[in-house]
Amino acid sequence: MALRTIDSLGDLRGRRVIVRCDLNVPLKGGVIGDDGRIRASLGTLTGLREAGARVIVISHLGRPDGTPDEKYSLRPVAARLGELLRADVAFADDTVGDSARAAVEALGDGDVVVLENLRFHAEETSKDETVRRGFAESIAELGDAFVSDGFGVVHRKQASVFELAQALPSAAGSLIASELEVLDRLTENPERPYTVVLGGSKVSDKLGVIGHLLPRVDSLLIGGGMLFTFLKAQGHEVGASLLEEDQVETVKGYLAEAEERGVKIVLPTDVVVADGFSADAAHEVTRADAIEGTPAGAKGLGLDIGPETADAFATIIRGSTTVFWNGPMGVFELEPFAAGTKTVADALTRVEGLSVVGGGDSAAAVRALGFDDDRFGHISTGGGASLEFLEGKRLPGLEVLGWQ
């Protein structure tokens, strides 16, 4: 069965449409650090407004542990959404209480209200299906139809993602549809050469993706903290760098499988090693197989890929027709260790084909380093969701919308 789209809901004029967005943006002191996820929601919200729907936006933000916490309030998000829509956006101080009901009652055709953080209610993320269903039904009382457009949460069986879609006539928004279209191109007959770039801190987070994509890719480039588990699997010492000792044997298996399949797993030839985890730590570039030969010795921390590796990765990326990247190459938040990530990001902007930035830390990195979104083929809004899709896992938030 195909994914249900908004068209399946019929005429929406005057109807109350609850839209589950993923507006989980970085927020500090009420200031939004990156509004990319808010911008990503605009297509669906604008379409619903133009159709005359009365739009009720719901989302989570952060992890407030099931109780109200002002620092996780969606109020600043509602204000920014209003600026981007160039329209008045109302805000309700609760999710299913008197404020929410009054705000929804006051909506006219084409109006928008944002309800308070879903995760101020422990029921949203409860492991008990009955509890989640009860909360979903409370939300459903506010609307006539439901649109799921938070791609970043479709891998989670939560009340506003799974049960709410069963409580009302439901469909996927345009953001989810576009995400699936792009991810399909990465798994179903991708144009070649096809390169996957993986970074980030833990190799254990990426094992499923590696296993699922090995039969499909031409090259797999490994950076970030996870590279040190690969180096260890090759017999190299890695100092005090991040290492998942319990994954070494699994990595050895993938290295052997890649060789059998003729897939190139490209590991760094040089790394930036520091004597501490700070921007002012003494650091130097060294060969990847000689980390403990630096002045820091066994206490040396590998915090970025080296310039030789970055250039080699960039050459492979630029020569590819399809590229998927998930995970920074180093600790990009600290300027001395951002060069590898910046070089890889720049190479993706030069791909003459499909370049996909896989959400999460990768999306944050390219924006923090000054790259505009439109320089890439696609920046996913779903870090974990994108990875689980590429692992071939079943995603409950999609299946409930008819996706198979």
Swiss-Prot record:
Residue positions binding ATP: 206, 302, 333, 359-362
Main location per the UniProt record: cytoplasm
GO CC entries: cytosol
This protein's record includes keyword Ion transport: no
UniProt keyword list: ATP-binding, Cytoplasm, Glycolysis, Kinase, Nucleotide-binding, Transferase
EC number assigned by the record: 2.7.2.3
Record's subunit section: Monomer.
Similarity field: Belongs to the phosphoglycerate kinase family.
HAMAP family, A to Z: Phosphoglyc_kinase
Name the record gives this protein: Phosphoglycerate kinase
Organism: Clavibacter sepedonicus (Clavibacter michiganensis subsp. sepedonicus)
Lineage: Bacteria, Bacillati, Actinomycetota, Actinomycetes, Micrococcales
Gene name in the database record: pgk
